[in-house]
Amino acid sequence: MRIRRNSSLDLGRFSDPSLLILSSLASGPKHGYAMIQDIEQFCGTHLEVGTLYGALARLEKQGWIEALALVERRRPYQLTQLGITVLREQLATMNQVVSTGQQRLATI
C-alpha cells in the first residue's frame, strides 16, 4: 500500500485507504481522480492510483460501494446502504478511540 502524506506525523499502517474512500463517497458519487483530490483536501493524504483502485475493487467485492455508468470515460462509484452502515460503525469506533486517547493524554 502506497500512501503519501503531507505531514511528518505518518501513521503508516494505522491509516486505512478504505475508510478514506468511504468517507469521500459519503458526500456523493465520485470517480477515482475526484476521490484522490477530495481525500488529499480533507485529510492531507495522497492515495496512489494503484492503492485507490485496489481498494475500490475490494470495497466493491464486499458490497460497500457500487460502480455507476461511465461518465465521459470515467467510472464513478457510490456508497451502498451496507457501505453507509459500515462507515457509520467505523467512525463511531474511531470516535471512541479518539475520546479515550484524548482522556489518557490529558493525564500525562
Residue ranges and their predicted role:
Residues 72-91:
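Basic, amphipathic "hinge/linker" alpha-helix immediately C-terminal to the N-terminal HTH DNA-binding motif
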Residues 8-51, 71:
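N-terminal helix-turn-helix DNA-binding core of bacterial DNA-binding proteins
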Residues 88-108:
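Amphipathic alpha-helical dimerization/coiled-coil segments
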Residues 60-71, 78:
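Beta-hairpin "wing" of winged helix-turn-helix
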Residues 52-54, 58-59:
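Basic amphipathic alpha-helical segments that dock to polyanions
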Residues 1-4:
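Long, low-complexity, charged/polar intrinsically disordered regions in eukaryotic proteins
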Residues 24-27, 68, 86, 90-93:
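Histidine kinase transmitter module recognition
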